[in-house]
């Protein structure tokens, strides 16, 4: 299983929080001090807390659980998508639509519409339409794909949410809390950790830091999946030849 070291975090700038005047007092216990009016996060807490979260992801994945990566702000969007694709998981990286989890029945209908449009775009249906109608359907498909493309094959609610920026994604956290879905989130010094089951105190704006978190979670998913394959092979009686 992948672990992240203090050195990895220092190199990525995980310890740099926000300006002191923007702090959230609920993050006080995770702050080491301040330098040039910027809060410094105590990585001696972040390292074990993040590694505990990674162990949880590993465990969920070893049981074929689904991980939903969420990060809709610009600094997180690409890394969230890349990590989810790398680990064959699911993502929301543009806008969190209210009810994405709590109103799954309606979301499922929109996903069905997206898949229908995708089929139409390849089976010749679009070619048979007027230019205007084909353009309208293409635009509808692109809009749906932007919102739902990352979860279209999720096939039900996720088993855990991994989030970059707890404040920015507070609606997702609230929905997960309502449904009893565990939440792992990077929480910066200006954010509220309430509702987060696995708090990862750290910078949520620096691309290198965000990429570090996302890659580590993706690697934990992959190692969990490998464990599942080994266990299944043992159950089925497959033994490697000497």
Swiss-Prot record:
Keywords: Ribonucleoprotein, Ribosomal protein. It comes from the Bacteria. Coiled coil: none annotated. Belongs to the universal ribosomal protein uS2 family. It comes from Colwellia psychrerythraea (strain 34H / ATCC BAA-681). GO terms for cellular component: cytosolic small ribosomal subunit. Transmembrane segments: none annotated. The gene is rpsB. GO terms for biological process: translation. GO terms for molecular function: structural constituent of ribosome. This is Small ribosomal subunit protein uS2. It holds the Pfam family Ribosomal_S2. PANTHER family: 30S RIBOSOMAL PROTEIN S2 PROKARYOTIC AND ORGANELLAR, SMALL RIBOSOMAL SUBUNIT PROTEIN US2M.
């Amino acid at each position: 299983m992948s672990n992240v070291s203090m050195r990895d975090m220092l190199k990525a700038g995980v310890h740099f929080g926000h300006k002191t005047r923007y702090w959230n007092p609920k993050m006080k216990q995770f702050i080491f001090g301040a330098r040039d009016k910027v809060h410094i996060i105590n990585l001696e807490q972040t390292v074990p807390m993040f590694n505990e979260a990674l162990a949880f992801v590993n465990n969920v994945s070893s049981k074929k659980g689904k991980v939903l990566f969420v990060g809709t702000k610009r600094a997180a969007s690409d890394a969230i998508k890349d990590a989810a694709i790398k680990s064959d998981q699911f993502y929301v990286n543009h806008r969190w639509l209210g009810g994405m989890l709590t109103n799954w029945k309606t979301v499922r209908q929109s996903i069905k519409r997206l898949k229908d449009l995708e089929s139409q775009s390849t089976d010749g249906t679009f070619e048979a339409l007027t230019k205007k109608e084909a353009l309208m359907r293409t635009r509808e498909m692109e809009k749906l794909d932007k919102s739902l493309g990352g979860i279209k094959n999720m096939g039900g609610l996720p088993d855990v949410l991994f989030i970059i920026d707890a404040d920015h994604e507070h609606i997702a956290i609230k929905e997960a809390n309502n449904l009893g879905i565990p939440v792992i989130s990077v929480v910066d010094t200006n954010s509220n950790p309430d509702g987060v089951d696995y708090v990862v105190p750290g910078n949520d704006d620096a691309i290198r830091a965000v990429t570090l978190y996302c890659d580590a979670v993706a690697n934990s998913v992959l190692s969990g999946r490998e464990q599942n394959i080994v266990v299944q092979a043992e159950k089925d009686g497959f033994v490697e030849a000497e």
